[in-house]
């Protein structure tokens, strides 16, 4: 069964993870977020109950 032979697939997996970790990840981390986190407490609004016309 060729899929049990790890020789070709292990090197492909290692090269893929190294590419992700060394090339792509630093480029992705330089992007700024569109909604930066703030230190303000989030304001929660109390929802008003629905006024059903038949009750």
UniProtKB/Swiss-Prot annotation:
Cited InterPro entries: ATP8_metazoa (IPR001421), ATPase_protein_8 (IPR050635)
Region feature Disordered, mapped onto this chain: 34-55
Keyword annotations of the record: ATP synthesis, CF(0), Hydrogen ion transport, Ion transport, Membrane, Mitochondrion, Transmembrane, Transmembrane helix, Transport
Record bears the keyword Ion transport: yes
Annotated S-S bridges: none
Stretches that traverse the bilayer: 7-24
Location of the protein in the cell: Mitochondrion membrane
Membrane topology: Single-pass membrane protein
Principal cellular location given in the protein's record: mitochondrion
Listed GO CC annotations: mitochondrial membrane; proton-transporting ATP synthase complex
GO biological process, one term: proton motive force-driven ATP synthesis
Keyword Ion transport: yes
Single GO MF annotation: proton transmembrane transporter activity
Complex and partners: Component of the ATP synthase complex composed at least of ATP5F1A/subunit alpha, ATP5F1B/subunit beta, ATP5MC1/subunit c (homooctomer), MT-ATP6/subunit a, MT-ATP8/subunit 8, ATP5ME/subunit e, ATP5MF/subunit f, ATP5MG/subunit g, ATP5MK/subunit k, ATP5MJ/subunit j, ATP5F1C/subunit gamma, ATP5F1D/subunit delta, ATP5F1E/subunit epsilon, ATP5PF/subunit F6, ATP5PB/subunit b, ATP5PD/subunit d, ATP5PO/subunit OSCP.
Function: Subunit 8, of the mitochondrial membrane ATP synthase complex (F(1)F(0) ATP synthase or Complex V) that produces ATP from ADP in the presence of a proton gradient across the membrane which is generated by electron transport complexes of the respiratory chain. ATP synthase complex consist of a soluble F(1) head domain - the catalytic core - and a membrane F(1) domain - the membrane proton channel. These two domains are linked by a central stalk rotating inside the F(1) region and a stationary peripheral stalk.
Family: Belongs to the ATPase protein 8 family.
The name this protein goes by in its record: ATP synthase F(0) complex subunit 8
Organism whose genome encodes this protein: Aythya americana
Lineage summary: Eukaryota, Metazoa, Chordata, Craniata, Vertebrata
Name of the gene encoding the protein in the UniProt record: MT-ATP8
